[in-house]
A protein has these predicted regions:
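A mobile, often basic/glycine-rich helix-loop segment
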Residues: 380-408
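Short low-complexity, flexible loop/linker segments enriched in glycine and/or proline
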Residues: 339-343, 366, 387-390, 577-579
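Short, flexible loop segments at the rims of nucleotide/cofactor-binding pockets, characterized by
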Residues: 347-353
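Gly/Ser/Thr-rich phosphate-binding loop
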Residues: 373, 413-417
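Short, conserved alpha-helical segments within structured domains
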Residues: 105-109, 276, 330-334, 356, ...
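Short acidic/histidine-rich active-site segments
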Residues: 369-379, 383-385
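Adenosyl-5′-phosphate
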Residues: 1-4, 10, 24, 43, ...
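Cysteine-centered catalytic environments shared across enzyme families
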Residues: 1-345, 357, 361, 555-562, ...
């Protein structure tokens, strides 16, 4: 896990890439790579690559980056891991065409794989990655993001050059980079708690979508291509029995966990006590000579909105004989963390779970662990959220042949009753407009509520009529390519394309890297995802219980009481904390923000605060703090 940065100057520009220019951007990301740093600049000063190193695989100086091949025609700056690099290296060694300068660097495998197979080498990579590769012979720059979007990559095209980095804050060190809010990204943030790729909250800065590459030529032409989509790989398992599918799932997940143990530094597991992290822990412990190291977070005191899961984490740790570590957090620590949080986020990631993710990452580092496996992805692949069951029922109702005129009459009645901010109104509106009920596994504000929340003058700057516009390309692809266009498959696919890569995985990446720790995600190995999306809906949800199939697959692997207890999820008791210092800080910050800017309607903001809408208020606070740190400075 590292930090990537660089620039490529087009033929119509006189700009020159210099060492101070690259180092200034690179060293905003020291936390991503505290173990070393490097810079390479082409002789004509038209191309530059920089790198911050967190040493994990092949710790030798020979594996430092940016790395060039033997004749200097290919150079790469790489963030992430290629878990199957040893197998690919053997294939390349058999050709006899390549000289190797490292013992087992996956970075060098990328260089020689590209030389051998071109960009099609991505088909062979199994891992999480974001990299920039310069092809000197063709004068082409390649920017690549992994299939699921575990690793980020941002870029900006301005003043005759493209500048790119693992973090936005690096791009902002370019003296010609503007700092302005993207109006439509802001509008979509209020729905999705994040911004949909390729947008970021910064006007003029883009992020590479998951499973996508860019090819940039010195003329300034940019070609974008989606090289992976799950519907190109999922093959329906219609003839397989439920038992056979369960066996395949566990075998695939066992392989995924095993691949993510490959490291030259200590590896541990984040353990919440839920099914996903407990399954990771059980599989990780198999074949280990020593105890697996596990890390958990809880909260001081009792909270109605979030109950500590430490009992279950300890229960799982004891079963596998883990070396278990845990820490209790409180509201004062969250308040103190807010400035660091928004700086690490780069753009608002409106999820208070950023706080415990950072703290558990720091706990692992303090105990000598550099890499941890995490449980993201299982809920989306196996219907793990209570809201999903409700949404599936609502979608079935929406599909009934009820005339649209009757649905619109219902909307009018709800408006007259002052209920147009409610989820019920939004669900009915989507049904009347022919939109799917489900947009995302996490939604902040309805379309009608956003119209009240956003200040009138700022609304005029927003061209989008609805945040459905951000999802329409995803829906078109689903309708064209999905082998089974069930409601459940749509929900999973929508979250694979937006919520996972741009919200859940970014909170993990930004916060873990803020503590200089690498996070690996076994449930989102692309082979496992392809298998999960090949399972018929009737088998995946069985009798209708949440995570029906996964629960049956892991019985005997983890304690029964962990499997059968109600779903809770990894959270933060912000509702209660808003009644103390956090609430005072929030009222003051949002009052100041509303008076200084024209983004929100102040009356609507304080209506939410007075109503105790803690989580929604958090989304607004996150944006206000980010704006002050990144835009108003």
């Amino acid at each position: 896990m590292c930090g990537v940065v660089g620039a490529f100057v087009f033929v119509n520009s006189r700009f020159s890439v210099t060492v101070p220019y690259l180092e200034r951007m690179r060293d905003t990301m020291v936390h991503r790579g505290p173990d070393g740093a490097g810079v390479w600049i082409s002789p004509d000063a038209r191309v530059g690559l920089g790198h911050r190193r967190l040493s994990i695989v092949d710790l030798s100086d020979a594996a430092a980056q940016p790395m060039a091949n033997a004749d200097g025609t290919l150079l790469v700056s790489f963030n992430g891991e290629i878990y199957n690099h040893a197998a690919i290296r053997k294939d390349l060694e058999r050709t006899g065409r390549y000289r190797w300068k490292t013992d087992h660097s996956d970075t060098e495998v990328i260089l020689h794989a590209f030389a051998e197979w071109g960009i099609e080498c991505l088909e062979r990579f199994r891992g999480m990655f974001a990299f920039a590769l310069w092809d000197q012979a063709r004068r082409e720059l390649w920017l690549v993001r992994d299939r699921i979007g575990v690793k980020p990559l941002y870029y900006s095209v301005h003043h005759g050059r493209i500048v790119f980095a693992s973090e936005i804050k690096a791009l902002l060190e370019d003296p010609d980079q503007a700092r302005a809010v993207h109006p439509e990204a802001f509008y979509h943030y209020l729905s999705f708690l994040t911004t949909p790729a390729p947008q970021t909250m910064f006007d003029g800065i883009s992020k590479l979508a998951a499973g996508t590459w860019l090819r940039v030529r010195d003329s300034g032409s940019i070609e974008e291509h989606c090289y992976w989509d799950v519907w190109d790989r999922a093959e329906p398992l219609d003839s397989a029995s439920e038992g056979e599918i369960r066996e395949r799932l566990i075998a695939s997940l066992r392989e995924s966990v095993s691949l993510r143990k490959v490291s030259d530094v200590p590896v541990g597991v984040f353990l919440s006590g839920g099914i996903d992290s407990s399954t990771n822990t059980a599989l990780f412990s198999e074949g280990e000579a020593g105890p697996v190291r596990t890390f958990s977070i809880g909260y001081e005191g009792d909270h109605a909105s979030y109950r500590n899961e430490l009992y279950y984490a300890r229960r799982m740790a004891a079963q596998v004989g883990a070396e278990h570590h845990e820490r209790l957090l409180n509201a004062d620590e969250l308040i103190d963390f807010l400035p660091t949080m928004v700086l690490l986020q780069d753009e608002p990631i409106a999820d208070p779970v950023c706080f415990p993710v950072y703290c558990v990452s720091k706990l692992a580092r303090e105990n000598g662990v550099i890499v941890c496996q995490v449980g993201e992805g299982a809920d989306e692949l196996f219907c793990g959220y209570p809201l999903w069951k409700t949404t599936l029922a609502l979608q079935r109702w929406s599909d009934w042949p009820v005339p649209a005129v009757l649905k619109r009459l219902g909307l009018s009645a709800l408006r007259l009753a002052g209920r147009d901010r409610s989820p019920r109104y939004e669900w009915l509106r989507r049904s009347a407009e022919g939109e799917p009920v489900f947009w995302s596994g996490a939604e902040a504000f309805t379309e009608a509520h956003k119209q009240r929340l956003i200040a009138r003058d700022f609304r005029r700057k927003i061209e989008a009529r609805s945040s459905w516009e951000a999802l329409q390309p995803v829906r078109r692809r689903f309708d064209e390519a999905a082998w089974d266009r069930s409601g459940l498959n749509w929900m999973t696919y929508a979250d694979l394309r937006l919520r996972l890569p741009e919200l859940l995985l970014m909170r993990v990446d930004k916060m873990s890297m803020g503590a200089s720790l690498e996070a690996r995600v076994p449930f989102l190995d692309h082979k496992f995802v392809e298998l999960a999306m090949s399972i018929p809906t009737r088998i995946k949800i069985g009798d209708g219980r949440l995570k029906y199939l996964l629960k049956k697959a892991v019985r005997g692997l983890i304690p029964e009481e962990l499997i059968d207890r109600p779903k809770q999820g990894f959270g933060v008791p912000v509702h209660e904390w808003f009644f103390g210092r956090l609430g005072e800080r929030t009222r003051a910050e949002l009052d100041r923000f509303c008076r200084d800017t024209g983004y929100f309607d102040r009356r609507e903001v304080f209506r939410l605060i007075d109503a105790g809408a803690g989580v929604q208020v958090w989304y607004l606070l996150n944006f206000a703090l980010w704006w002050r740190a990144y835009v108003a400075r």
